[in-house]
């Protein structure tokens, strides 16, 4: 089993329009009329010169930008990374829309929502990570990242977290082997965890 299998599944899963919509509805169940065509992937390929890549960026109807990271090892630094991802995403949006930042008229940009999906086994993690928690003293800029984890709802995010836990259990049992992958897929399909997705991409996971 590849160590990156959980990241690969996250990336491939939410690049598919039907699962992008399911992800959005897990976060915004009130917006039930949203269509697959309302979404645009804005995941960054590279941020600055540091080689940073973010897991998933979604633009919704030109009014909302969702940045979502998956993390199995908890890190309080995710708020700082999200600041870099958000700056890069806005830079691309401004260039694409040919917006004039030096003009006298207000520039309208999509509002951001920032999330980290925590799939590790640490019991106590904060519900929100803040950039200001990293400051040495007071500061004038803030970034807030909501921490999402297994909540028993069985929505697409909950299923992804469950998939990661099953994958970890099978890797611990069988090591980095094909058997670990096969068992992960078998158990997930039996439990209806990402079953259609895993069945369709079984040879690639």
Protein language model annotation of sequence segments:
Residues 1-205:
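Elongated, amphipathic alpha-helical interaction scaffolds
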């Amino acid at each position: 089993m590849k160590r990156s299998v959980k990241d690969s599944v996250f990336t491939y899963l939410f690049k598919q329009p039907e699962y992008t919509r399911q992800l959005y509805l897990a976060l915004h169940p009130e917006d039930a009329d949203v269509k697959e065509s309302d979404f645009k992937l804005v995941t960054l390929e590279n941020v600055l010169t540091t080689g940073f890549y973010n897991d998933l960026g979604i633009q919704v109807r030109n009014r909302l930008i969702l940045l979502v990271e998956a993390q199995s090892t908890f890190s309080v630094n995710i708020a700082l990374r999200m600041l870099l991802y958000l700056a890069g995403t806005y830079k691309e949006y401004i260039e694409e829309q040919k917006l004039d930042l030096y003009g006298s008229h207000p520039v309208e940009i999509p509002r951001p929502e920032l999330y980290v999906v925590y799939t590790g086994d640490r019991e106590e993690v904060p519900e929100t990570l803040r950039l200001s928690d990293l400051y040495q003293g007071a500061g004038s800029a803030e970034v807030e990242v909501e921490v999402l984890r297994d909540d028993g709802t069985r929505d697409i995010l909950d299923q992804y977290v469950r998939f990661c836990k099953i994958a970890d259990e099978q890797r611990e049992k069988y090591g980095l082997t094909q058997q670990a992958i096969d068992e992960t897929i078998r158990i997930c399909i039996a439990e209806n965890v990402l079953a259609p997705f895993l069945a369709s991409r079984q040879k690639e996971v």
